[in-house]
Amino acid sequence: MTWITTSLEAARMANRKHGRVLMEIDRLKDILSLDTSHDFHYVKYIDPDGVPVRLYHLTAFGLAMLDVGRGKTALRWKAEKLK
Protein backbone atom coordinates (compact mmCIF):
# COMPACT_ATOMS: atom_id res chain seq x y z
CA MET A 1 0.00 0.00 0.00
CA THR A 2 1.37 3.40 -0.94
CA TRP A 3 0.42 6.32 1.24
CA ILE A 4 1.07 9.71 -0.31
CA THR A 5 0.22 12.06 2.56
CA THR A 6 -1.31 12.36 6.02
CA SER A 7 -4.48 13.96 7.32
CA LEU A 8 -2.31 16.48 9.18
CA GLU A 9 -0.49 17.55 6.01
CA ALA A 10 -3.81 17.75 4.12
CA ALA A 11 -5.22 20.02 6.84
CA ARG A 12 -2.15 22.25 6.79
CA MET A 13 -2.13 22.62 3.00
CA ALA A 14 -5.88 23.35 2.91
CA ASN A 15 -5.54 25.87 5.75
CA ARG A 16 -8.12 23.89 7.74
CA LYS A 17 -8.19 22.60 11.29
CA HIS A 18 -7.05 19.00 11.53
CA GLY A 19 -10.21 18.17 13.48
CA ARG A 20 -12.34 19.22 10.49
CA VAL A 21 -10.33 16.97 8.18
CA LEU A 22 -10.77 14.08 10.63
CA MET A 23 -14.53 14.69 10.66
CA GLU A 24 -14.55 14.60 6.85
CA ILE A 25 -12.64 11.30 6.86
CA ASP A 26 -15.12 9.83 9.35
CA ARG A 27 -17.98 10.98 7.12
CA LEU A 28 -16.38 9.43 4.03
CA LYS A 29 -15.77 6.13 5.83
CA ASP A 30 -19.46 6.02 6.80
CA ILE A 31 -20.71 6.88 3.30
CA LEU A 32 -18.44 4.69 1.17
CA SER A 33 -19.71 1.13 1.01
CA LEU A 34 -16.31 -0.35 0.21
CA ASP A 35 -13.53 -1.19 2.63
CA THR A 36 -11.53 2.02 3.03
CA SER A 37 -9.24 0.89 5.86
CA HIS A 38 -6.21 0.92 3.54
CA ASP A 39 -7.15 4.30 1.99
CA PHE A 40 -7.60 5.97 5.39
CA HIS A 41 -5.07 4.14 7.57
CA TYR A 42 -5.25 5.13 11.26
CA VAL A 43 -1.93 5.54 13.04
CA LYS A 44 -1.02 6.62 16.55
CA TYR A 45 1.06 9.78 16.43
CA ILE A 46 2.69 11.65 19.30
CA ASP A 47 3.28 15.33 18.52
CA PRO A 48 6.50 17.13 19.55
CA ASP A 49 4.84 18.17 22.84
CA GLY A 50 4.14 14.52 23.73
CA VAL A 51 0.41 14.77 23.05
CA PRO A 52 -1.25 11.83 21.23
CA VAL A 53 -2.88 12.95 17.97
CA ARG A 54 -5.38 11.04 15.83
CA LEU A 55 -3.81 10.80 12.38
CA TYR A 56 -4.48 9.00 9.10
CA HIS A 57 -2.15 8.04 6.28
CA LEU A 58 -3.94 8.56 2.96
CA THR A 59 -3.59 6.77 -0.37
CA ALA A 60 -4.18 8.59 -3.66
CA PHE A 61 -7.79 7.35 -3.58
CA GLY A 62 -8.26 8.59 -0.01
CA LEU A 63 -6.88 12.00 -0.90
CA ALA A 64 -9.02 12.17 -4.05
CA MET A 65 -12.14 11.55 -1.95
CA LEU A 66 -11.16 14.16 0.63
CA ASP A 67 -12.23 17.75 0.02
CA VAL A 68 -9.16 19.84 0.81
CA GLY A 69 -10.79 23.11 -0.15
CA ARG A 70 -10.87 25.36 -3.15
CA GLY A 71 -7.89 27.60 -2.51
CA LYS A 72 -5.15 27.78 -5.13
CA THR A 73 -2.45 26.43 -2.84
CA ALA A 74 -4.56 23.48 -1.66
CA LEU A 75 -5.64 22.54 -5.18
CA ARG A 76 -2.09 22.77 -6.55
CA TRP A 77 -0.82 20.65 -3.67
CA LYS A 78 -3.54 18.03 -4.22
CA ALA A 79 -2.90 17.93 -7.97
CA GLU A 80 0.84 17.44 -7.38
CA LYS A 81 0.20 14.61 -4.88
CA LEU A 82 -2.18 12.84 -7.27
CA LYS A 83 0.18 12.95 -10.28
What residue ranges belong to the model's regions?
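An anion-engaging/catalytic patch
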Residues: 1-83
